[in-house]
Amino acid sequence: MTSRNYLLLTPGPLTTSRTVKEAMLFDSCTWDDDYNIGVVEQIRQQLTALATASEGYTSVLLQGSGSYAVEAVLGSALGPQDKVLIVSNGAYGARMVEMAGLMGIAHHAYDCGEVARPDVQAIDAILNADPTISHIAMVHSETTTGMLNPIDEVGALAQRYDKTYIVDAMSSFGGIPMDIAALHIDYLISSANKCIQGVPGFAFVIAREQKLAACKGHSRSLSLDLYAQWRCMEDNHGKWRFTSPTHTVLAFAQALKELAEEGGVAARHQRYQQNQRSLVAGMRALGFNTLLDDELHSPIITAFYSPEDPQYRFSEFYRRLKEQGFVIYPGKVSQSDCFRIGNIGEVYAADITALLTAIRTAMYWTK
């Protein structure tokens, strides 16, 4: 481990502001009203307001990574007679399929391939053919490739077929404007260390209260019982059932303040989008090609094909970039040799320019 700080060009954990880090210097008591009412309850209200102005929604915080919350929703929202259609076009959709299988949840996996946009007509046909499907689950920003999936079109199908709609918005909520009521989303899942620019330690679910209230007794897990966690927070004014990650929560409260100071989700989305466009333009000028067509890209992370030069090794490229203060991500696509660069967090136009200069310097195979 080194004391040197790097700029993380990853989809989270990501580079955070100095003030978000400093917020963790305070120690909180998990029984204290100053913490539970003054911090946790405020966060819950702010998250719900960020998601929609409509009534009837609530939020629940849950210890662990984003995958913990995804598993909590799947394991709590689906009763023993329910069945979920899981739309999968990457590692995170595939993870939902794996979770459902391990929990014994009836499911239909629609796998459209890692570089293909989900076919809404195909989803329509599946729903039409199988009336036993009660829920639909999908990822919004699939960071395996950087693809932004059509949650609006699938949401319209969920409304038409009267299905409960679950969206993993891990790498989009807080960075892409959305109204979950207008999108017909019943459960939206995200994490502290993504677009809101906090640090790892907890995830959260913003849910239609009527749906969440019907989940009692469904959970396949004690710790991941979303209904029980919600009732504890509701009945005890922000109290967590088990140990609260207090320092992470304080950092997140500060991150929410900084989101508002930046101009809210719309302003942050504009920054992320400009970062991504500048990154792609600069990488293409250096000779790199994107895995996806431009119209499929999210403003969060971009996958680039690895150079075909036989001298190229990602590990060496990574090392040379890290020496210059930049950290990127390896590829996760099974059928293509690629690497990924994220552009969220405390990353601005000057950082993208500096990164591109560092990449040019690190391209040892061209020398």
Curated annotation (Swiss-Prot):
* Gene3D superfamilies per record: Aspartate Aminotransferase, domain 1, Type I PLP-dependent aspartate aminotransferase-like (Major domain)
List required co-factors. pyridoxal 5'-phosphate
List the Gene Ontology MF annotations in alphabetical order. Answer: 2-aminoethylphosphonate-pyruvate transaminase activity
Q: Which reaction does it catalyse?
A: (2-aminoethyl)phosphonate + pyruvate = phosphonoacetaldehyde + L-alanine
Which terms are listed as keywords in the entry?
Answer: Aminotransferase, Pyridoxal phosphate, Pyruvate, Transferase
Q: What is its EC number?
A: 2.6.1.37
Locate the N6-(pyridoxal phosphate)lysine modifications and list their residues: K194
Q: What's one Pfam family the UniProt record gives for this protein?
A: Aminotran_5
GO BP terms = organic phosphonate catabolic process
Protein family membership: Belongs to the class-V pyridoxal-phosphate-dependent aminotransferase family. PhnW subfamily.
Known function: Involved in phosphonate degradation.
* Complexes and interactors: Homodimer.
Q: Which HAMAP family match?
A: PhnW_aminotrans_5
Protein name per Swiss-Prot or TrEMBL: 2-aminoethylphosphonate--pyruvate transaminase
Specify the species: Salmonella paratyphi C (strain RKS4594)
Q: Which gene encodes it?
A: phnW
